[in-house]
Amino acid sequence: MLRNIYVYIKYITIGSDKLNIIKQNLDKEVNLFIPDDIEEIDFEDSLVITDVPEDEFKMQAEACGKDSCEVKAAGFNTKPGDGYSYVCQTLDMGISYYRLVYARLTGEPFVVAETKNLLIREMTTKDLPELYAVYSTLEDCRYIEQLYDYDKELEFTKNYIKNMYGFFEYGLWLVFEKKSGELIGRAGIENREIDGVTCREIGYLIRRDMQHKGYAYEACQAILEYASDELGIQEMFAVIDKTNEPSRKLAQKLGFELYAQTDDGPDLYKFVFG
């Protein structure tokens, strides 16, 4: 878990106003430090933002007796050849972005949102057994595409984490009930071609015994907020079977409006962020 952010700037000047912006964007769970020397940096549970090229930074860390393998750092105004996977062009990013960078660098699943009752995060391959249990409660639901056999699903999940989460920074996420800690469903954002254009589609499913508690609505509300505030998405679609009345009612409750219909296919609903 990210607990500390160190802004270690050596070659450029950062005004106090910029540092104050970072402080304003953090929350009470994350501390901000402005070290004068690399010796002052504790790499455990920390993200370092620095203008020092990666190779040079790791050499400095090793010279101080620190393990450079523990370094989780993002470049600030660094060049593509400086080695960092993530580069911050500005320091006024929100805490969600810093947590995302830290998750990518550590390989931990990124927590997308936390609501009153739910926690929504990226999935890992370790979640597959629980995910199969969720889908087993929905085997008779014709609106849901079932998972592959385990070996194929495992390979699919590995590629999904790398190519969907890693490239688009969104996808289908896992939904956990906070009070029990149990996996109760999936919800998130997928890509779909509509009118020849790649658009974003919201998707959701809830474990059978956890339905009718308002969890799908709560999860989708949080996802729409994240899509607007963190991803800058301006519109979202929902593709709903004509006979899927619960899903249609949920979409309309969320603010989706009918966009297009076909004679023999699903209906298309659209949400425009105001």
Q: What do these predicted ranges mean?
A:
Residues 4-8, 21-24, 89-209, 226, ...:
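GNAT-family acyltransferases
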Residues 43-45, 170, 233:
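Short, high-confidence coil segments that cap the C-terminus of an alpha-helix
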Residues 64-67, 252-262:
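Conserved acetyl-CoA-binding loop of GNAT-fold acetyltransferases
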Residues 204-206, 212-229, 245-253:
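Conserved acetyl-CoA-binding loop-helix of GNAT-fold acetyltransferases
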Residues 230-239:
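Conserved GNAT acetyl-CoA-binding A-motif
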